[in-house]
Amino acid sequence: MYSNVIGTITSGKRKVYLLSLLLIGFWDCVTCHGSPVDICIAKPRDIPMNPMCIYRSPEKKATEDEGSEQKIPEATNRRVWELSKANSRFATTFYQHLADSKNDNDNIFLSPLSISTAFAMTKLGACNDTLQQLMEVFKFDTISEKTSDQIHFFFAKLNCRLYRKANKSSKLVSANRLFGDKSLTFNETYQDISELVYGAKLQPLDFKENAEQSRAAINKWVSNKTEGRITDVIPPEAINELTVLVLVNTIYFKGLWKSKFSPENTRKELFYKADGESCSASMMYQEGKFRYRRVAEGTQVLELPFKGDDITMVLILPKPEKSLAKVEKELTPEVLQEWLDELEEMMLVVHMPRFRIEDGFSLKEQLQDMGLVDLFSPEKSKLPGIVAEGRDDLYVSDAFHKAFLEVNEEGSEAAASTAVVIAGRSLNPNRVTFKANRPFLVFIREVPLNTIIFMGRVANPCVK
């Protein structure tokens, strides 16, 4: 599973591109001012977080679940837990804005964590209203910390929790890179924090004289990191002599089901789309014990674990009489958490389509609707902390996200047989059935922190 965000920070004359995608990388010990610092065991006092500007919250922002009992995972920093919850709030809000702009028959897939990380890296260089809007839109201001600079420390700790797993049966890794124009001197503090917190080293390129070669170099780096899954992520003419910086955040996940679907049980069945039309999908099948619950208005919630149990796929399937669009509009982080808390293990018959989703879209319109206005404005954007000497003519001209998900009998991104055989299915009328033969929501989450890594909807699994 991959997710990719490309954005452009531009000035009156120069641009900065933001790329957030899902690919392969590692979180390691980095060097800051000559001293090796392992970000995963460091204390706040060990890490100098001194961006050019700091946003100070006037008061703690009330949240929907304030006052309720918080079940914070063992050995988890409270602020890291709150950052994970902030990501969930951004995820559901952004998804609703995106779904409103799409046709009900369109598949959707994205990584809210990837998007948040890319814009957190941008926030390092932001000031004034631009910084405040980034804090508010990405829900960073809901964290019980009065200053914006500490968000980066908590991001580092969250990354350590997510990406430094000993489990070898599922792979969740991340990489970041800054590609900067070689003619410019970048703010030293911006570079230091980007590398220390996000592992994003600066690689100089010649955007001014060799824009096309620079584009090819970045695309090649992305292709290599994704094992060739994502190519030409930056389209022709997207980089030119005005480009200043390309920021790349990447996340990649590959997992095998804890309980695999047998290819011999896969057969063609009708999938009923939102518009009333149907298509022929390869429907997988298995019986087993899974965490499941029928919740409000007959909506079914099913959790399928990957090997290792730390990462799971959650499917939300409305009853046939209720549209998925209605569920999407009603979904909040609190509702989702309530549903997950109610799941119970039981014997289940699962019918689920084999599918592959590739999605790509601009983030600009949805983020502007959510209140991130100044960052995209040549007149209002304040990003003086990126280039040396406080240059203040940069803005984000656009931001794009690309994502990829493939699910089959083996799990995610695994090679599997293409044989379709009608055999091996049992009929047990006493067991609960989860049959995803109509549009459903999909989440991939890290269980202990309930971090939403990916989310989307499967509206048409028949798309090639």
From Swiss-Prot:
<keyword id="KW-1015">Disulfide bond</keyword>
<dbReference type="InterPro" id="IPR033829">
    <property type="entry name" value="Antithrombin_3_serpin_domain"/>
</dbReference>
<keyword id="KW-0964">Secreted</keyword>
<keyword id="KW-0646">Protease inhibitor</keyword>
<feature type="modified residue" description="Phosphothreonine">
    <location>
        <position position="63"/>
    </location>
</feature>
<feature type="glycosylation site" description="N-linked (GlcNAc...) asparagine">
    <location>
        <position position="167"/>
    </location>
</feature>
<feature type="glycosylation site" description="N-linked (GlcNAc...) asparagine">
    <location>
        <position position="128"/>
    </location>
</feature>
<feature type="disulfide bond">
    <location>
        <begin position="53"/>
        <end position="127"/>
    </location>
</feature>
<feature type="disulfide bond">
    <location>
        <begin position="279"/>
        <end position="462"/>
    </location>
</feature>
<dbReference type="GO" id="GO:0002020">
    <property type="term" value="F:protease binding"/>
</dbReference>
<dbReference type="Pfam" id="PF00079">
    <property type="entry name" value="Serpin"/>
</dbReference>
<keyword id="KW-0094">Blood coagulation</keyword>
<dbReference type="GO" id="GO:0030193">
    <property type="term" value="P:regulation of blood coagulation"/>
</dbReference>
<feature type="modified residue" description="Phosphoserine">
    <location>
        <position position="68"/>
    </location>
</feature>
<dbReference type="InterPro" id="IPR023795">
    <property type="entry name" value="Serpin_CS"/>
</dbReference>
<dbReference type="GO" id="GO:0007596">
    <property type="term" value="P:blood coagulation"/>
</dbReference>
<feature type="binding site">
    <location>
        <position position="177"/>
    </location>
    <ligand>
        <name>heparin</name>
    </ligand>
</feature>
<feature type="signal peptide">
    <location>
        <begin position="1"/>
        <end position="32"/>
    </location>
</feature>
<feature type="binding site">
    <location>
        <position position="81"/>
    </location>
    <ligand>
        <name>heparin</name>
    </ligand>
</feature>
<feature type="glycosylation site" description="N-linked (GlcNAc...) asparagine">
    <location>
        <position position="187"/>
    </location>
</feature>
<keyword id="KW-0325">Glycoprotein</keyword>
<keyword id="KW-0358">Heparin-binding</keyword>
<dbReference type="GO" id="GO:0005615">
    <property type="term" value="C:extracellular space"/>
</dbReference>
<keyword id="KW-0732">Signal</keyword>
<comment type="subunit">
    <text>Forms protease inhibiting heterodimer with TMPRSS7.</text>
</comment>
<comment type="function">
    <text>Most important serine protease inhibitor in plasma that regulates the blood coagulation cascade. AT-III inhibits thrombin, matriptase-3/TMPRSS7, as well as factors IXa, Xa and XIa. Its inhibitory activity is greatly enhanced in the presence of heparin.</text>
</comment>
<feature type="glycosylation site" description="N-linked (GlcNAc...) asparagine">
    <location>
        <position position="224"/>
    </location>
</feature>
<dbReference type="GO" id="GO:0008201">
    <property type="term" value="F:heparin binding"/>
</dbReference>
<keyword id="KW-0356">Hemostasis</keyword>
<feature type="disulfide bond">
    <location>
        <begin position="40"/>
        <end position="160"/>
    </location>
</feature>
<dbReference type="GO" id="GO:0004867">
    <property type="term" value="F:serine-type endopeptidase inhibitor activity"/>
</dbReference>
<dbReference type="InterPro" id="IPR042178">
    <property type="entry name" value="Serpin_sf_1"/>
</dbReference>
<keyword id="KW-0597">Phosphoprotein</keyword>
<dbReference type="InterPro" id="IPR042185">
    <property type="entry name" value="Serpin_sf_2"/>
</dbReference>
<dbReference type="InterPro" id="IPR036186">
    <property type="entry name" value="Serpin_sf"/>
</dbReference>
<feature type="site" description="Reactive bond">
    <location>
        <begin position="425"/>
        <end position="426"/>
    </location>
</feature>
<dbReference type="InterPro" id="IPR023796">
    <property type="entry name" value="Serpin_dom"/>
</dbReference>
<protein>
    <recommendedName>
        <fullName>Antithrombin-III</fullName>
    </recommendedName>
</protein>
<feature type="binding site">
    <location>
        <position position="161"/>
    </location>
    <ligand>
        <name>heparin</name>
    </ligand>
</feature>
<comment type="similarity">
    <text>Belongs to the serpin family.</text>
</comment>
<dbReference type="GO" id="GO:0042802">
    <property type="term" value="F:identical protein binding"/>
</dbReference>
<dbReference type="InterPro" id="IPR000215">
    <property type="entry name" value="Serpin_fam"/>
</dbReference>
